[in-house]
């Protein structure tokens, strides 16, 4: 068994994307490879077949390996619920909420979970492709590190260091990161990868030669800037749009301070007939055909944010003029009459008034609901699949008019009697082509084009593997993976 780790000089350097690319590149060669991220901090997550929760990036990487997501692929997941605290998820299950200081003391326990998962994967897969987190050179986070070099040292694996040249200062990033590592950690770095380059590679070559001479380490390759690559963002909100046709549906989403699983909106962002706008604090709220309240890791706090930024008034006006309103997960809970958090799971214990648009109330409970589901939208009997990640239990008369009839016999969500408002606990429902088309028609779009989001994701994964094949040193990569040269 061989473990190869990808670390980055910064956040968003391209670690997740490179691991996805390497996983598919190796899989195409018949190599049995599995993705792994020791510790992930993100509000975008996925549900595994065994009812656990992992980072969404690892679910995409699993797809690149043609594997079902498993909790061992991301044994530690941190989901921030305040500026200083986060829910700690170990092996797919929420175990506690901690502030940063408390978690620092918890890292030894977390490392045990990380090494346990790595050991289990090593028993079934000859190659483990690991993604680091942030930068390995964060001096204040070096003690008891489990996400980067601390893990690499523990399992004795080689490391590739990737940097984003599009940000500028790529050579300073690479050399500076290397020099901030200990001698043993520096020895683990077996090469550099430069990401998102655009221009004439000949103009970059003198810099590459200098880098290799300065560090004694090879440049494994230079990956080009790809304009229209659309894989789910691990954490940051992706607001890029595809080209639109003349007839579009205007969809508006508030950017909540604790927005979660905003990858729900990627299929809409890529749809040629949808103009998707994310509205941040202080921005004017534009007219829309459809307003969607997204998921939230701190629903009561984010509901206060909506009120403070004029959204409650804007929603009332929107509905008065015939617009459609949708809530997903935390957004569904906001649509009801009351939100109760008696245990203080998402902040201070207490209750808040909801928007009062659907006759229902929610109580937050300790046990989180985690499951992948299939069913049919009651709108058009359209097939839908998605996943539930929520701690709330919602009850009330509004649920009698469900939004989704699930295959397991349960009903999900609610619709208003006038058909203007719809809420659901299901994340990922826009990824189902039939359900997406049905919801867009409900919101007022005529002659809806069907878009297969899963096919688009698969196409992009294949494109990534092609880039590895063309631009990186395959012989060195195979050697680092413990494989013979082809």
Curated annotation (Swiss-Prot):
Membrane spanning stretches: none
A Pfam family this chain is assigned to: GATase_3
Coiled-coil region list: none
Molecular functions per Gene Ontology: ABC-type vitamin B12 transporter activity; catalytic activity
Domain GATase cobBQ-type, residue spans: 248-435
Residues annotated as catalytic: 329 (nucleophile), 427
Any Gene Ontology biological process: cobalamin biosynthetic process
UniProt keyword annotation of Ubl conjugation present: no
Similarity comment: Belongs to the CobB/CobQ family. CobQ subfamily.
Function noted in UniProt: Catalyzes amidations at positions B, D, E, and G on adenosylcobyrinic A,C-diamide. NH(2) groups are provided by glutamine, and one molecule of ATP is hydrogenolyzed for each amidation.
NCBIfam families in UniProt: cobQ, PRK00784.1
Stated name of the protein: Cobyric acid synthase
Species this chain originates from: Pseudomonas syringae pv. tomato (strain ATCC BAA-871 / DC3000)
Gene expressing this chain: cobQ
